[in-house]
């Protein structure tokens, strides 16, 4: 199990409420924007074997098809799973329906700074962690702010 196959799951919903067509509108010199950037990064990542693109956006599906890349497995997501009200639990179940076995890398088009080299590094760290009986890896950010709730300070005295 040193090098298990890695399938990237890329959910990409049409209908952003704040920025219309945000996933495919021109951005940073890329004609097809965030989806173009993310698919390029995942295709270039040596440790990503397949990319399951789940979207309800025909324009994104057409763009992905135009790439003619065997790594990409496009999936037309049903509208029931494409609303802003769709729960994370429902989306996780959907991912497992599409990728019933193997190892999943979950990523988003709205993370354009995670490039191919970083994906490869993360996957290599994951594969190393598997040898120590870990079964998952999650990236996080250290918060250097002062957090409060209704009872007062949370992360300091």
Over which residues does each language-model region extend?
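Residues at the starts of beta-strands that form the adenosine-phosphate
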Residues: 5, 49-51, 103, 135
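Conserved SAM-binding loop
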Residues: 26, 53, 106
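Conserved core of the sugar-phosphate nucleotidyltransferase
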Residues: 90-91, 108-157
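N-terminal nucleotide-binding beta1-loop-alpha1 segment
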Residues: 1-21
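Short glycine-enriched, charge-decorated loop/helix-capping segments at active-site entrances
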Residues: 22-28, 78-81
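A short, N-terminal amphipathic alpha-helix
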Residues: 33-51, 62
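Glycine-rich phosphate-binding loop signature in dinucleotide/nucleotide-binding domains
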Residues: 3, 97-102, 129-132
